[in-house]
Amino acid sequence: MILDSYSKEIVGWCVGDSLRTEYPLEALKMELKRLDGKGHNLIHHSDRGTQYASSEYVRLLRDNGIRISMTETGDPRDNAQAERINNTMKNELLKGKTFTSMEEVINEVAKTVNFYNNRRPHMSINNMTPVQAAACVGEITKKWHSYQESKVGNIIYLHIVEL
């Protein structure tokens, strides 16, 4: 999954049956298609998983003008937003569901992403949904601050809209 840090919107996702690079690549391509060439000066932050460090993944980021940031340590708090969305998906939105096919998993994840982006408000974005927050310009008043923000000082996420 690819999460927009400003809006908390899931902007790219793909379901796979392994940890092969092809699945994160598909999620990244989904986001790049949405960006339509406007990815320059964005930062892609991830852990140091082999998928995100693969030459193909790194090349796609660089070819689209996206800067690369990776965690320094094995501390999950260094990639807290990714850990949080994975936890929310698994333990809140998909908890207790069983599937008999990959097609069922893909369909359920698609519905869950749609719900998460369009109907689930977040305290971290002033109780807006991610889609509502994505429509904003400027600083969003936050109800709480992340571990990373408390560690490095106040981080302001600004949403710049190209006209």
Where are these regions (language model features)?
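RNase H-like DDE/DDD metal-dependent nuclease/strand-transfer catalytic core used by mobile genetic elements
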Residues: 1-110, 114
